[in-house]
Amino acid sequence: MTKRKLTQNQKRRIHSNNVKALDRHHRRAKKEIDWQEEMLGDTQDGVVVTRYSMHADVENSQGEIFRCNLRRTLANVVVGDHVVWRRGHEKLQGISGVIEAIKPRENEIARPDYYDGLKVMASNIDRIIIVSSVLPALSLNIIDRYLVICENANIPAVILLNKVDLLTDEQWREAEEQLEIYRKIGYETLMISAISGKNMEKLTALLADGTSIFVGQSGVGKSSLINYILPEVNAQTGEISETSGLGQHTTTSSRLYHLPQGGNLIDSPGIREFGLWHLEPAQITNGYREFQYFLGTCKFRDCKHIDDPGCALREAVELGKIHPVRFDNYHRLISSREENKSQRHFMEQDIR
């Protein structure tokens, strides 16, 4: 009997289930350390540079990294968190100490999860770098989805188009025209290639200031960018799936890196879909910065900005003040939000 060939999705599910089973076994075999007062030193400040399921790596003021347990009373600890922690007088089961408290966050980036609600990914970020590429095909709808998140989190965004070495001259001009839509409304854009090195010096100069985070679908080349910027990290890269056109997930844990030219970079696991169903329609509307001048000037206060008479946004599109692609994407995001919210409702019913 011929052995059935597994699809890439099936292989990923099997791998994921195996990892979860091993993690459950690890939890049972390795009891949580009960840190007593006499076992710990004084409190000190630190920054979370990596988060795992049960532990977090904390960097102290001298740049040393210690693996720590988390107090049960803490909310979700994420990469970028400034924390108060205590080092143990001795290392126990490979653990050096415990995180006692999380300092107030300046900001955070979160994504909705069907089972866990809103999941914070990272905190204390100075800019979000939205990584897109020409393979898979450039999607302005996905870029707009990320921008809505950035605007609602009040974190500046930069749009990065990777793999431009694959473009013909005509495709380059088309990509420039698409990115010009965003430049006209105040977003910074970069066209780069981690393979040829084109414009990579502009990216490294941008990253030298503050803490940045890469977000983007799998397969857009985030790991390749990190390998170029930090070759000693050797982040695992993945191939594009021939069947779906999507990349294979390669990064498993969010991590903060210090860059040699200054600044920090957070690499987060690839996200295929950045859902918006946790946002209200008004929040999605407010996520379009060029809409702000026209909001509140529609004929009717409850205008849905679809085919309502006297819609100021639609009039602005007709006058060339709002790009029609952005307006179409806005409607698609509103529509997909309702669909995803309905799917979540049915999933919650199944769970109950």
Swiss-Prot record:
Its main location: cytoplasm. One of its GO terms (biological process) is ribosomal small subunit biogenesis. Its cofactor is Zn(2+). Keywords: Cytoplasm, GTP-binding, Hydrolase, Metal-binding, Nucleotide-binding, Ribosome biogenesis, RNA-binding, rRNA-binding, Zinc. It comes from the Bacteria. Monomer. Associates with 30S ribosomal subunit, binds 16S rRNA. One of several proteins that assist in the late maturation steps of the functional core of the 30S ribosomal subunit. Helps release RbfA from mature subunits. May play a role in the assembly of ribosomal proteins into the subunit. Circularly permuted GTPase that catalyzes slow GTP hydrolysis, GTPase activity is stimulated by the 30S ribosomal subunit. This is Small ribosomal subunit biogenesis GTPase RsgA. The gene is rsgA.
